[in-house]
Amino acid sequence: MIFLNKDILLSNIDKIHTTGMGIDRIKMNLKLDTNDVVKFCKNKILDNNCDIYKQGKNLYCEIDNIKITINSYSYTIITAHLIK
């Protein structure tokens, strides 16, 4: 089941996007200097070490002490946090 979620997300990688508020939230939470947070998140998701799993309607991607939350229906990046 884990591999299925990962395969589905990776096959839809071009659909991943976020909102203006999402950009601000992700930049603040991860302390990023880049304006292209979607590219940053996609690169993390594409990393072979990324742990991808689904809970409810969301997909979660964990790598490098970062947790990215993506809506599994719209592929919208909702938020990203540092894992403490």
Predicted regions and their residues:
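Ribonuclease/tRNase effector modules and their secretory precursors
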Residues: M1-K84
